[in-house]
Amino acid sequence: MGVNKIMYKGKRIKLIWEKVPDCLGIFDPNVNTLLIDPKLKPSTMAKIIFHELWHVICYFNKTNINLIGEEKTALLSEQYAVILKNNPKLKRLLYKCLKRKK
C-alpha cells in the first residue's frame, strides 16, 4: 500500500495492511499499531482510515472515546471521506495547503 507508518505528536504508529478477524481496521494503543484490511474498496478504506485516525487522535489526547461511543465515532469521523470525495476542489486545496515546501 506504500504507507507503513503514521507520525502523530512525535509518536510513530506502525501501519500494517492485513485482514483482522471481525473488523475492517483496528488501532492497538498498547503497541502503537494500526491494522487495516488491504482488500477494502477504496471508498470504504478511506472511511476506515479516518475512523481509525480518530481513535489515534483520541488516545494521544487522552480523550475517553467510550464517552463518545463507537457509533458516533464512526458516523462523524467517516464523514471526512465523504466530504473530500464529493468536493475534489476542496481536496486539492487541502493537499496544496499541507504540501511540504521544498
Regions found by a protein language model. Name each.
Residues 1-44, 60-102:
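Metalloprotease/metallohydrolase-associated module, dominated by Zn2+-dependent proteases
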Residues 47-59:
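Active-site recognition of the HExxH zinc-binding catalytic motif
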